[in-house]
Amino acid sequence: MNIEKHLISLINDLCQISGVEVGQHFYWQLGGFQVHAQVLITSWVVIVLLSGLAFVTTRDLRTIPTGGQNFVEYVLEFIRDLTRTQIGEEEYRPWVPFIGTLFLFIFVSNWSGALFPWKIIQLPHGELAAPTNDINTTVALALLTSVAYFYAGLHKKGLSYFGRYIKPTPILLPINILEDFTKPLSLSFRLFGNILADELVVAVLISLVPLVVPIPMMFLGLFTSAIQALIFATLAAAYIGESMEGHH
């Protein structure tokens, strides 16, 4: 009888953990508009962290970098090489800040979800989580990427950019148009799904085996979070490069 009660209690606990309250959000009322405050709060925290890092590491620049300046220059060189590889030697420079901003924001957001216990901060409704754990954030980033590669193509080719939709044959016009909708969808849902799944798995494991299993899973989550940031930035740069070079 005790075993049955224990199993029933365990099942109830798992059901509570797996129940994601998708409709529960914390809103700010601004005039006649409701602003989704949860993702704004955590996004501002990430922005402050990145701004603080930039300020601290660049306030005393030296010809021979040391410490934080050396680290930031290494990150910048990595982002520059990634952008140059995907966009091309001649066109990549103006896009380094955009790709770098995407990569760093997603990277720090993902890691904040794995390292910072957002849920200990109580809200009237819903709960805090990593910015990229919210579909609003990932869709916004994907739409920014879409605007960027449309701008890149139109800026370089003018109205002739739209000729790519009928290449290599006009029969592919519907497919090429559909592709422009699937790109932001795939970017946003891939990032959102991976981060949400990682946080749910860690939460379940912590409830079942609090001390042993969650530690390696957290390291795996950190690795996955870094990879997702790299994938998003790489694909964004690739889409921009493709829009300027034509149909690949």
UniProtKB/Swiss-Prot annotation:
Q: Which family does it belong to?
A: Belongs to the ATPase A chain family.
CDD domains found in the cross-reference section: ATP-synt_Fo_a_6 (cd00310)
Q: What is this protein called?
A: ATP synthase subunit a, chloroplastic
Q: Which UniProt keywords apply?
A: ATP synthesis, CF(0), Chloroplast, Hydrogen ion transport, Ion transport, Membrane, Plastid, Thylakoid, Transmembrane, Transmembrane helix, Transport
Q: Where are the transmembrane segments?
A: 37-57, 96-116, 135-155, 200-220, 221-241
**Chief location category:** plastid
HAMAP family listed in its UniProt record: ATP_synth_a_bact
Q: Where in or outside the cell is it found?
A: Plastid, Chloroplast thylakoid membrane
Q: Which PANTHER family match?
A: ATP SYNTHASE SUBUNIT A, CHLOROPLASTIC
What topology in the membrane does the UniProt record assign?
A: Multi-pass membrane protein
Record note on quaternary structure = F-type ATPases have 2 components, CF(1) - the catalytic core - and CF(0) - the membrane proton channel. CF(1) has five subunits: alpha(3), beta(3), gamma(1), delta(1), epsilon(1). CF(0) has four main subunits: a, b, b' and c.
- Identify the Pfam families for this entry: ATP-synt_A (PF00119)
Q: Which residues form a coiled coil?
A: none
Give the function comment from the record.
Key component of the proton channel; it plays a direct role in the translocation of protons across the membrane.
User: Is Membrane among the key words of this record?
Assistant: yes
Alphabetical list of InterPro entries matching this protein = ATP_syn_F0_a_bact/chloroplast, ATP_synth_F0_asu, ATP_synth_F0_asu_AS, F0_ATP_A_sf
Question: Tell me, what is one Gene Ontology molecular-function annotation carried by this entry?
Answer: proton-transporting ATP synthase activity, rotational mechanism
Keyword Chloroplast carried by entry:
yes
Question: What's in the GO CC field?
Answer: chloroplast thylakoid membrane; plasma membrane; proton-transporting ATP synthase complex
